[in-house]
Amino acid sequence: MSKIIGIDLGTTNSAVAVLEGGEAKIIPNPEGARTTPSVVGFKNGERQVGEVAKRAAITNPNTISSIKRHMGTNYKETIEGKDYSPQEISAIILQYLKSYAEDYLGETVDKAVITVPAYFNDAQRQATKDAGKIAGLEVERIINEPTAAALAYGMDKTETDQTILVFDLGGGTFDVSILELGDGVFEVHSTAGDNELGGDDFDKKIIDYLVAEFKKDNGIDLSQDKMALQRLKDAAEKAKKDLSGVTSTQISLPFITAGEAGPLHLEVTLTRAKFDELTHDLVERTIAPTRQALKDANLSASDIDQVILVGGSTRIPAVQETIKKELGKEPHKGVNPDEVVAMGAAIQGGVITGDVKDVVLLDVTPLSLGIETMGGVMTTLIERNTTIPTSKSQTFSTAADNQPAVDIHVLQGERPMAKDNKTLGRFQLADIPPAPRGIPQIEVSFDIDKNGIVTVRAKDLGTGKEQNIVIKSSSGLTDEEIEKMVQDAEANAEEDKKNKENAELRNNADQLVFTVDKTLKELEGKVEEEEVKKAEAARDELQEALKGENFDAIKEKTDSLNEIVQNLSVKLYEQAAAEQQAAGGAEGQEAPQNDDVVDAEFEEVNDDDKENK
């Protein structure tokens, strides 16, 4: 079975890992980094991904970051006149991860395990699966990030039973999961979280502070200047990271904007104390989900054996201090918070292929599932933190006499009223025979698969008539849309490959022109004038072709010039060899004299030896 890669598709950074020799290994990207910024840029029809796109963001307005925050919504990014869904942008990132994983492994990769925040709802999970499909990946499993982290942490610790709490604060989402580890079984007891809390929010607090300080000093609102805002974003992220290691950092942005008197510069010293003050409310928001997860698992803080920190934002000292204070124990720091999720996904890939044995993963659904019933109430069929895969059925009836159809409004959430929860979808069971209200028996069944994706079925028990749907939110893509996006992605990949080949061809041609100029100088007076003119003419033709975009012509002229230069080089070597031979002949004539000299020296040495004796 071909390898299944593990992908952590993050809000700010992504990573890819693979199982090799029974161990999960992070695959470095072409720049040598172990994580890749989840940033996509479009410039003159070309796509840039990762660090390149992030660096260019200051000058390129067509740059998209933190797209994960829009997964499962109707959000669209319009770039160069084309609308992109979050799934398409995520697919571009996945395609890039896939391509460098293939380069590393030396084989085609078409299967992956992709992680999502534990608190992702059905629409967000479905969108992630669609993104994988668009990128040309068969998504073997969608698993929760904290669960993946626990897998990576606990692979070599399965002989001892322990309860672990995974505290996962990433770039855009926050999750807490509590798991039981023992005898190769990783069982999730509870999960809680906040999909609107992450490192991006900490950055924004710094940005808002810098904007306010600058406005106070200069009367100019930098938030209205896109380029200045991008520079502030980069500076805020850097300052946040710096303050994890030092207590004070200098934010210096020269020429941030211009006032009436000329250029203006931003110079601010940000202390860790000030940063903690600015972000206090964000850190506090991690406490409620932590307590909720403990409550749902029927555990207290003292029952937790180990606290695992996941996600780059857990490096923030105030976050570490808060979790330590809340749970009364020092968090475990033996795993890399940026890499552990992708490694866990790779291990899950190994479980699927059979390379990892005696490991069982029991995950849970993060949110309750149900339908709307009379009075706009949500009736729950599957409670949150139910182990998946699972299915549950319940029988309902009609609300009016002779009701011909039943509308099934599928919901996900914890609020008692339907309107306050997330709508996953709607469908209708029609052709119910006329009968008084309360008589027809309508069985509604929910089925959640191992990826946490929901299928709902409604059946009229009287007639046996049945209707079912795999839930897709209003933002979900149709099979036709996904297929079109797959084709677009493949075409773009082909185009990207062609662009790369053309760039290499142009570079090689430029290099050849340079080499020819150098060679012709060396050949001056050594080969016939006619040969030189022929080479110069071919070189000029290639230079002319390089001014245009006809790559077939560039290739043809390059090949032609190459052939001429090779012939010239052969002649040069032949000439050099002839000269060397002539020189060798001259040396041969002097050889006897040389022999005499050598003999004389030899005699002298012998005489000396005799004297010494």
Curated annotation (Swiss-Prot):
Q: Decide whether keyword Lyase is in the record.
A: no
Q: Which residues carry this modification: Phosphothreonine?
A: 173
**GO terms of molecular function:** ATP binding; ATP-dependent protein folding chaperone; unfolded protein binding
**Residues covered by region (Disordered):** 578-613
Q: Describe what upregulates or represses it.
A: By stress conditions e.g. heat shock.
Q: What SUPFAM superfamilies does the record point to? A: Actin-like ATPase domain (SSF53067), Heat shock protein 70kD (HSP70), C-terminal subdomain (SSF100934), Heat shock protein 70kD (HSP70), peptide-binding domain (SSF100920)
Biased composition range(s): Acidic residues: 596-613
Query: What's in the keyword line of the UniProt record?
Result: ATP-binding, Chaperone, Nucleotide-binding, Phosphoprotein, Stress response
Cite the record's Low complexity compositional bias ranges.
578-591
| Xref: InterPro entries | ATPase_NBD, Chaperone_DnaK, Heat_shock_70_CS, HSP70_C_sf, HSP70_peptide-bd_sf, Hsp_70_fam
Pfam families according to UniProt: HSP70 (PF00012)
Q: What does the UniProt record say this protein does?
A: Acts as a chaperone.
User: What does the similarity note say?
Assistant: Belongs to the heat shock protein 70 family.
This chain belongs to which protein, by name? Chaperone protein DnaK
Q: What is the lineage of its organism?
A: Bacteria, Bacillati, Bacillota, Bacilli, Bacillales
